[in-house]
Amino acid sequence: VNTTDWPAADFEAHRVHLRSVAYRMLGSLNEADDAVQEAWLRLSRADTGDVRDLRAWLTTVVSRVCLDMLRSRSSRREDSLDVHLPDPIVTRVDDDPAEHAILADSVGIALLVVLDTLPPAERLAFVLHDVFAVPFDEIGPILDRSPAAAKQLASRARQRLRNAPAHQATPRGSASAAAAPGGSGDLARQWTVVDAFLAASREGDFEGLLAILDPDIVLRAEAGAGPFGPSVVVRGAREVIAQAQRFAPLGRFARPVLVNGAPGFLVVRDGEPLALMAVTVQDGKITEMDVLADPARLTALDLTAVIP
């Protein structure tokens, strides 16, 4: 292989993989693109004569860039009490998530929210190993740790995920059974629950809602300067039902969509997106709801596939 041709010939072949890694590390599509661009700049300046596996080399580079970004973000956010949801990827209900390369090994919004609570090194170790099957002997050097220490970081991350509300430990290659659909049959069962929720909401059926919502459900709403009141985190079925009344008048404008490959719906009125809701379903109950109603963030989303 003539490695001097790598920057021009092969970087694009790895761009989608690198963006997928960065998105799961950062939960931000714009920051993921920035990290990938930085990897390209470093590749273009590097002497790659000794590089034998460009994909692994680039994965290491983009992971280090993401680690620096996470550490910088942690220092900025440590005093912030605002609700901040990760960037969602919104597609049509009839889309196959597998056809969207960035959604391979889909990580749902609910899991990304929990990943945002992890220390940067734990998040990196978990994402690289459990989602992308990178061995610990490659993860250790990225973190300036031994492979054994990297393994311990991933284990600690898994434990935090187990202890998070409505989350379970999951095997490598599927970062969250709760946050990503496990197949067409599983997705159909989830839609049955979501459709029942919408119907009960529109009819004001309190008992019907209680039957659908997990008693320990968590609702996170990022409202920004929108018309729905302040951003909130609410726990418990009765409390969530009370909060959901804020959105009830707009129920007739809700259209089903996939949010990171899992059920959700987008509220659109007169062609304008007003709110996006991602729903996590486990064992026939809704365990988490994440609502993005910040007008500035909604405007920035790529919704061309779902708003004609």
Positions of predicted regions on the chain:
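Active-site-adjacent scaffolding segments
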Residues: V1-F197, D205
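Short beta-strand segments that buttress and anchor functional surface loops
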Residues: G264-D270
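Low-complexity, intrinsically disordered terminal/linker segments enriched in charged
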Residues: L292-P308
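A solvent-exposed, acidic/Ser-Thr-rich amphipathic alpha-helical stretch
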Residues: P215-A254
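Hydrophobic pocket/interface hotspot
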Residues: L209, I217, G284
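Short, solvent-exposed coil/turn segments at beta-strand boundaries
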Residues: A262, T280-I286
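A short acidic/small-residue loop/turn micro-motif
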Residues: G49, G271-E272, A293-A296
